[in-house]
């Protein structure tokens, strides 16, 4: 009798768990469908960057985003422009599916990157909010990776958590990418993504990404959707008229540096350094024909500095 009761309880528990999982999956499918219906979106976003263990954000940026679904783009499947939230005529970043545009306001230059300089296996383009959220949910519903998910009712919104337990960290540049491991041990490779979904429209309004080395949080407001299409988007419309347009690769062209052989016989420039007693020593004070200079560099990492 007791065994039958125990088996009944276990069976009921399995049924309840299965029903909850099915309900979670069906709701995520609904949210994904809503995200896939977005052809364009404008919104304000606050982006925060954190270091794990810190109590305050390392940086906080406020932007106004115009995001467009772009099926022709094979990288992230979207194009977008990021503008200063306090001055929406001031360009911060732009990606149209072919190029990315990086403004350098201090010297009035626009760097155009066509991704031919230092090409990578995929374009490192940070996706806009709704494109990112869409690909996170699609991955959660379809992946064969080792994941755990949670969907929780929090009153006015649902909280969704995705934990990816793989041997490599997973980032989303459009689709999910398992990032190559560095040559040193990074510790945990767990990737965590969290979404807060508004019940009023079944769309995410906040997302959080956590890796061992970095945490980022994005929060949207003043959302307007489907008032434009990708055909209304032209990156050059956001170029400041008085800025010089340069190639991104030109920013990294180094001037020819003198070789050691070309310095032989040349007069050394004057300099002043400190000796091991922290006393200043100048070149003019040195009378020897040959001088040995020993330079030491001490690097203090963030964890050491905090401690």
Label the predicted regions:
Residues 19-69, 142-149:
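N-terminal leader/targeting segments and the immediate start of mature chains
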Residues 47-49, 82, 103-107, 208-212:
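Beta-turn initiation residues at beta-strand->coil junctions
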Residues 71-130:
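An acidic-aromatic
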Residues 298-307:
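Single conserved hydrophobic/aromatic residue that forms the stacking wall/gate
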Residues 130-200, 279:
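Extended beta-strand-rich segments in extracellular/periplasmic secretory proteins, especially
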Residues 1-26:
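Bacterial Sec-dependent N-terminal signal peptides
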